[in-house]
């Protein structure tokens, strides 16, 4: 069954004419300016200072440095908590494990480690208190 070319043109025009364009679901609105947008404002990138200074040596013998990166339970703290880079965190974990094996650091939390810290804190907090002016001792006559 052959359809003539003129009939084909007519079919095409009829089909296109009866087809309706899709209606938009919501009216299109221009984007709001940044001051009128809802939600959280954009955060500016903030550079955090590292707890390890450039001159510090990450080593199993440097216990004063390593001790800052261990929790009270004796666990190694995460990178987020420590605020160190990936390379520094890897070196820290290796140094902590070496210090534990050589028994410089305990595997579990001990009282001795935290008693030392408490003593240091007490010494710092027992600084001289300023006397109030109204309560001075009067010299004896």
Swiss-Prot record:
| Protein's UniProt keywords contain Ribosomal protein | yes
Name the domain of life this protein comes from.
Eukaryota
Return one Gene Ontology term, BP aspect. translation
- Give the record's keywords alphabetically: Chloroplast, Plastid, Ribonucleoprotein, Ribosomal protein, RNA-binding, rRNA-binding
Q: Name one Pfam family in it.
A: Ribosomal_S18
Q: What is its main location?
A: plastid
Which Gene3D superfamilies does its entry note?
Answer: Ribosomal protein S18
PANTHER family, alphabetized = 30S RIBOSOMAL PROTEIN S18, SMALL RIBOSOMAL SUBUNIT PROTEIN BS18M
Q: Outline the subunit composition.
A: Part of the 30S ribosomal subunit.
- Name of the protein in question: Small ribosomal subunit protein bS18c
Name of the encoding gene:
rps18
């Amino acid at each position: 069954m052959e359809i003539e070319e003129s009939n084909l043109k007519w079919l095409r025009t009829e089909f296109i004419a009866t087809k309706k364009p899709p209606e938009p679901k919501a009216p299109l609105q221009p984007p709001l300016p940044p001051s009128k947008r809802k939600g959280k404002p954009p955060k500016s990138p903030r550079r955090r200072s590292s707890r390890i200074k450039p001159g510090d040596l990450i080593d199993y013998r440097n216990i004063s440095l390593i001790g800052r990166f261990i929790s009270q339970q004796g666990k190694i703290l995460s990178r987020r908590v420590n605020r160190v880079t990936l390379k520094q965190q890897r070196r820290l974990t290796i140094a902590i494990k070496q210090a534990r094996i050589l028994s410089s650091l305990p595997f579990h939390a001990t009282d001795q480690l935290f008693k030392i810290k408490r003593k240091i804190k007490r010494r710092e907090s027992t600084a001289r208190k300023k006397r109030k002016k109204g309560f001075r001792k009067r010299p004896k006559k």
